[in-house]
Amino acid sequence: MKSIPVLDPALYPETTEFLECNNIEDFSDFELATALVDCDKTVPMAKEMFDFIVKLYENAIAEGDIYAMNDLGALYYDDRGCEQNFEKAVYCYEMAAKNGNRQAQENLGYCYYYGRNVDVDYEKAFHYFALGAFDGHLVSLYKIGDMYMNGYYVEKNPTEAFHIYERCMETMTDEAAPTVAGPVFLRLGNAFLYGNGTEENAKSALVCFQKAELFLYDMVADGEWMYKKSLEDAIEGQAKAREKLNENIPLIY
């Protein structure tokens, strides 16, 4: 029988409601861990709940669950107010990736792109992002766009990067939009603002930055803290786009 930690309902209302409305014995260890991770994402996770979820994932991993391998890695990678541990995250991602989990391969791409407990290795990052992109992961696809935009591992080609960002929007699904559209619109906004890979167009930049702000706001409000800087950039980008637009407004005497 699973022994669930007791939390303050005022601090963790979603977790409390989930536990009151469900019999946790009806859930597998992986299912229960996934449900608990999705609760109260806007507040730091309680340490006792973090430890409980880790144990649930470890139980599932012992049974060969590759999704638990990846999700435990994500729990260590993300900063939910407990133990952010890139070493453990990479270990879990590698374990899942070797067993064919494409999301883990994408996550490893991030680790090598940013040097999370491994040396920055753009060749490996490109390799893992390519695997994700071939499997339809739009995050992997726009990260490949970033590599062309910056000349990481591949020859710098802003035009190719811009086309990749456009391709992301062309193939965007309703399911992917809440977590992908914001970052892609931000990149398109910057491309239009500075004429990187396309003609400079302040009006198109403003539209993209506005759309980016809406999606990124929802991401941050849903607990995706790492996108707070992107949200700030989208707001700042609007100001820069408006400044350029105002330069072209004729003076009226």
Outline where the language-model segments fall.
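N-terminal alpha-helical interaction modules that lie
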Residues: 2-44
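Helix-turn-helix repeat elements of alpha-solenoid scaffolds
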Residues: 7-9, 44-51, 85-86, 121-122, ...
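Short helix-capping/linker turns of helical repeat alpha-solenoids
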Residues: 23-28, 39-42, 63-65, 78-80, ...
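Hydrophobic face of amphipathic alpha-helices that form TPR/SEL1-like repeat modules
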Residues: 34-41, 71-78, 82, 107-114, ...
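Terminal, low-structured helical/coil segments at or just beyond the last alpha-helical repeat
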Residues: 218-253
